[in-house]
A protein has these predicted regions:
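Hydrophobic faces of well-ordered beta-strands that scaffold small-molecule active sites
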Residues: 10-13, 61-63, 105-107
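Active-site beta-loop-alpha junctions enriched in small/polar residues
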Residues: 16-17, 66, 108-114
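N-terminal binding-site loop/beta-alpha segment at the start of enzyme catalytic domains
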Residues: 9, 15-48, 55
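Glycine-rich, proline-tolerant flexible connector loops at the mouths of alpha/beta enzymes
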Residues: 30-41, 54, 60-85
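Alpha/beta enzyme core
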Residues: 51, 55-56, 100
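Conserved, mostly hydrophobic/aromatic
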Residues: 14, 53, 93
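Alpha-helix-loop-beta-strand connector modules within alpha/beta enzyme cores
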Residues: 77-100
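Conserved small/polar residues in nucleotide/adenosyl-binding loops
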Residues: 117-119
Length: 119
């Protein structure tokens, strides 16, 4: 990766969770965008949303992993899906990148409070 890329202002994608809801994804507890990973019926919607962000000018897309931390998953009774959800988020982002190879993928991390300390 050319680190000079980040010496200029770059455009990232937008708020994925709200966009997925606006496009018809049903809310599921406090999973937000992780709900699109959990249910295969939303995988295409998630991919299409990544692609639309890219078409709108995003140079970097962020994986939908903001709410895939263990404590959030436990609160929603899907803690056993931790690995699957994080892998699936990367796979779907990679599909978008395959169509637009110049796009970069960033991993989405939640705020530190009650997130990474429980991994």
């Amino acid at each position: 990766m050319d680190l000079n890329f980040f010496k200029q202002t770059r455009i990232l994608d937008g708020g994925m969770g709200q966009e997925l809801l606006a496009r018809g994804m049903e809310p599921n507890g406090t999973l937000w965008s992780a709900n699109a990973l959990l249910h295969e019926k939303y995988h295409q919607l998630l991919l299409d949303t990544h692609l639309d962000f890219i078409k709108s000018g995003a140079e970097v897309i962020v994986t939908t992993t903001f709410t895939t931390r263990k404590i959030r998953l436990k609160d929603n009774n899907v803690e056993d899906k931790y690995e699957y959800l994080n892998i699936k988020a990367g796979e779907i982002a990679q599909k978008a990148k395959k169509k637009y190879p110049k796009t970069l993928i960033a991993g989405g991390l939640p705020p530190q409070y009650l997130s990474l300390i429980h991994i």
